[in-house]
């Protein structure tokens, strides 16, 4: 009922909620615009979602002629799952021109993950006839590499190269279930955006999941995990690799040993030698041929270089003869790539290379990346990339405490979080009696639930803050002595009179007993 719905939505919008109206009208016209604002209600919705099959040029013209903002108020809907990779979905019909791919309205991508993720099962069934009624393939670990490629194909174009977007009819990737495509790639009409600014930045390339956890290159937890709070800033472009002889290098995320299968469910080998992470669950891996230097642009940035600024790259190579360089593009010379040597390669563990940037004081870094050169099959893993002005190391976390600890290892801890402007995240670890580090969690916040700390006896609980340049604070520490805790908590039970249900042994009473810790009987 318009008489009730419009004033209701007008009220929600006026209170600061961003709202959007959708109906099956595939045009932006008077009927659609009536859901944006009118004389009686004022602003009703913040924007409208125009149904699929729309025409960006006509919508832009009508909006401008009638006083509407074609970018703030008009979103052209693109139904991703309906056409999949087969067509452009009509997004190119809304380009400014054949040469200028700037959309004439905003774009609303509807359920893209349905087709690059959920659509994998449809493609496997279509190609092989295989299904899995117990658990979809898209949820099984051995198929995740396919979903990662399909996601990059959706956003970066069929060739997973942001410099080669656009309709690629006939371009196929049969290994991941894509037989042909007309999809243009989001990068064809949306330039990279970035939150990287100021004078400090860091990333460990964490995708927020892992087959295991690593601390300074060593495995610190053998459990598979997923935690978006631990995700680092990922590359702005996936991928942008160039060389004089063409692109011969490839890029991926290296999780260490991981299972992979093909569309038939048969095991396939990784295309690189798995290394794993320096910190977190994965590193960036560059592999392939690089007889001619290959430059990979990774991050769009707006970083100010100061007199004491340095860049840090933690990396390793498969071959000692491989050369790696930091590759920078400055805002005042966007057509020039400045390369700075990272020194000799390390083939035995990770190398921490520091690069002095003081010669570039006063300039702004617009792009950060790497350049790789070497003979034969080259592989370089990168575990950290950072820029620092030496001002971002945070203080020791304050107020660290254990709020709850159970005998089976569950734990709730809390602390006083610092402002996000100065602290990127917090690392929670346990250090056992032998000095081994056991990674528990990493995220920004002021509390954490740990499902199980699988350690016996005494151990040290350690909390460290990570700064905006990746520097790490001194730890806040708590000693946990498991032997000082009560154990074997039980309560007296009995069957009811019919022998069917277990209940308290004495009606109206709960009788508890436990094994006292070695240090004595609890006093409260």
What are these model-derived regions, one by one?
Residues 389-421, 470-522:
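Pro/Thr/Ser/Gly-rich low-complexity, intrinsically disordered linker/stalk tracts
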Residues 321-323, 416-436, 515-524:
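Solvent-exposed loop/turn segments flanking beta-strands in beta-repeat/beta-sandwich domains
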Residues 333-364:
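Extracellular carbohydrate recognition and processing domains
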Residues 259-295:
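Short carbohydrate-recognition loop motifs
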Residues 449-475, 524:
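Beta-strand-rich modules
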Residues 313, 352-385:
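Extracellular beta-strand ligand-recognition surfaces/modules
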Residues 74-260:
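Substrate-binding cleft of secreted/luminal carbohydrate-active enzymes
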Residues 1-61:
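Chitinase-like catalytic core of GlcNAc-active glycosidases
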